[in-house]
Amino acid sequence: MNPIGRQTQLKKMEADWDRRARENARFYVVTGQTEWSDEEFFQSGRKTVEEEILTDMTNICQGKDPRQMRVLEIGCGAGRITRALSETFGEVHGVDVSGEMVDLARRALADRPGVHVYKNNGMDLSVLPDLEFDFAFSCIVFQHIPSRAIIENYVREVHRVLRPGALFKFQVQGCAEIETSPDDTWLGAPITDQEAVRMAERCGFEPRYRIGAGEQYFWLWFFKKG
């Protein structure tokens, strides 16, 4: 993809997600219902953490005390999962392409010490301070990104900020049968099992586990080599 095409995609991602945040942020973050109370919305984030994090603490913590860990969330949205992460880990940093979503997250998480949320450009982590992270996580985010190249750039950037041996656990769209287009910021680019393995290797990760290939919820466990 030429740089102009990529910049067009990134601007559309930002504009579309800003619009969705203004229309009904919680619906677009979790499409199960149109109206969410605060308790329902953040409880849904706790459910994700219970299912995907707390059942996997051996891989995630690797002997570390979670209260001493610094974690990164890609695509924090309105802070749904971010809040739940902060209830388990000592320090949580989140990034999102939408400034509108980031504003919502900052307001919702103002009472949570150790939580930091940043607006980024949708493909890298240059907005983060010079920190090393013990774990990175992303759920129902990459499934909306319209370009495999942008997804891979994110993966490479996560590799850059993780400590050696740390895990990046994330979900991508695995269903190759869905019809997508380069400007679709809802049904993003699917990733096959072979593409996931090649991506991991190009970015310096070991793709130790992969579950759900060919399905919407294709989970990847990428461990940073070293």
Which residues does each predicted region cover?
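Class I (Rossmann-like) S-adenosyl-L-methionine-dependent methyltransferase catalytic domain
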Residues: 1-89, 93-125, 148-149, 167-226
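A short glycine-rich, Lys/Arg-flanked "PGG" loop and its adjoining helix->strand segment in the class I
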Residues: 152-164
